[in-house]
């Protein structure tokens, strides 16, 4: 077997190629290895479903989809972005789970004259002083979901809050978000170690929360830290005593593991998000049904954002009939957000971050007994991030 053939076999469908030199080339940087790899695979699965839905064509041209693994490390993310820009000469770079990886990689894409579209990470600098005409988000700015949670806490009558979050860029944004809207007293706050040697033992922090007098606990623990925290929250006997509110901690990936472990403490917990798998619109219904049929699980928000990133790119390329050199035309079309989004209609602010609704969601069982996150109500309508005023576009 030739080296080239082996490469395509081993890629397991992560790279879709075209024989045409003038195709539309999209680079996708995400985490596929390490315990966080499940999140990246969710994103790639959704992007491939989006490509299936559009026949792998944009503006009449075939799409080449090139996936790179950042290994959960900013320096590798930058290297892979450099490769996509300089070697593969992609037209668009998207993906990016982690804020520190995106911040390390952004100049490689933008200085290289490419469109950069974050399908997850939303660090505050990119919404403010580091905004760029060729940067777009198909997700949210980091502060927004926790800002919605703060409003929920106020409506629920919470007066005293205990906060836990990893100590990195996104974690700091999440804490800033809930602190911006929560009107009560923060009785404790722990910023735990993140990265290669992330902290997964929260017994000391939970012991402090237990005696803090808190009415609720707010946490942000994405990836493998989420199930670890939920398990220990359950074991600490806090279920039914101190209600749990989360952002980016409880999703379809973690719920599958939690249900197998019979950790019922997560049932009835609350979180906020711009999207839910049971949002009632035709695009979302098709996306969720096809994702479940292909993977056997509910999609996460990571998947939803990745699906929308592909559709956003298509809206731009279609508008210029496949002429990827017409960046002004592509940019103008993408700014309209005129495509069928899984979240329903939204619009872009001057900093190219979505202005959109945020919803309260709860964890419950579906008709088949599977745990999932379900839409409850709208918390924030047409919400714009807090940093757009710093953007000079």
Residue ranges of model-derived segments:
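Periplasmic-binding protein-like
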Residues: 84, 88-97, 117-119, 160-165, ...
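Beta-alpha junction/loop-to-helix N-cap segments that form part of ligand/metal-binding clefts
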Residues: 38-45, 53, 57-126, 138, ...
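Sec/Tat signal peptide C-region and signal peptidase I cleavage site
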Residues: 17-21
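Extracytoplasmic "Venus flytrap"
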Residues: 27-46, 68-75, 97-98, 164-172, ...
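Venus flytrap/periplasmic-binding-protein-like
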Residues: 70, 117, 124-127, 239-259, ...
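Extracellular/periplasmic Venus flytrap/periplasmic-binding protein
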Residues: 79, 124-127, 132-236, 277-286
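Bacterial N-terminal signal peptides
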Residues: 7-16
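Extracellular/periplasmic periplasmic-binding protein-like sensory domains
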Residues: 233-307, 318-324, 363, 367, ...
């Amino acid at each position: 077997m030739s080296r080239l053939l082996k490469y395509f076999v081993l890629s397991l469908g992560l790279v879709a190629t075209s024989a045409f030199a003038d195709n539309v080339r999209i680079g996708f940087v995400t985490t596929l290895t390490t315990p966080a790899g499940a999140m990246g695979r969710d994103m790639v699965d959704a992007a491939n479903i989006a490509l299936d839905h559009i026949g792998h064509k944009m503006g009449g041209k075939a799409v080449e989809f090139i996936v790179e693994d950042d290994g959960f490390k900013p320096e590798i993310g930058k290297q892979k972005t450099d490769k996509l820009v300089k070697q593969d000469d992609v037209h668009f770079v998207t993906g990016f789970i982690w804020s520190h990886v995106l911040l390390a990689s952004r100049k490689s894409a933008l200085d290289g004259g490419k469109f950069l579209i974050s399908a997850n990470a939303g660090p505050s600098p990119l919404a403010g002083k580091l905004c760029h005409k060729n940067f777009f988000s198909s997700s949210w700015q980091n502060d927004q979901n926790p800002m919605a949670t703060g409003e929920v806490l106020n409506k629920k009558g919470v007066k005293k809050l205990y906060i836990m979050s990893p100590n990195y860029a996104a974690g700091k944004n999440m804490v800033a978000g809930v602190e911006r809207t929560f009107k009560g007293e923060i009785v404790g706050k722990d910023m735990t170690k993140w990265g290669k040697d992330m902290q997964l033992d929260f017994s000391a922090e939970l012991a402090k929360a237990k005696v803090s007098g808190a009415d609720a606990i707010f946490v942000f623990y994405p990836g493998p830290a989420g199930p670890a925290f939920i398990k220990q929250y359950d074991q600490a006997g806090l279920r039914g005593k101190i209600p749990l509110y989360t952002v980016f901690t409880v999703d379809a990936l973690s719920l599958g593991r939690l249900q197998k472990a019979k950790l019922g403490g997560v049932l009835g917990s609350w979180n906020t998000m711009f999207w839910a798998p049971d949002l009632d619109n035709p695009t979302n219904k098709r996306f969720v049904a096809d994702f479940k049929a292909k993977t056997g699980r509910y999609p996460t928000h990571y998947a939803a954002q990745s699906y929308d990133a592909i559709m956003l790119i298509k809206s731009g390329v279609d508008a210029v009939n496949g002429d990827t050199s017409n960046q002004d035309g592509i940019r103008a079309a993408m700014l309209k957000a005129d495509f069928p989004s899984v979240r329903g209609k939204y619009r872009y602010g001057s900093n190219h971050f979505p202005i959109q609704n945020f919803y309260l969601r709860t964890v419950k069982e579906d008709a088949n007994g599977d745990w999932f996150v379900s839409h409850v109500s709208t918390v924030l309508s047409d919400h714009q991030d807090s940093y757009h005023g710093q953007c000079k576009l």
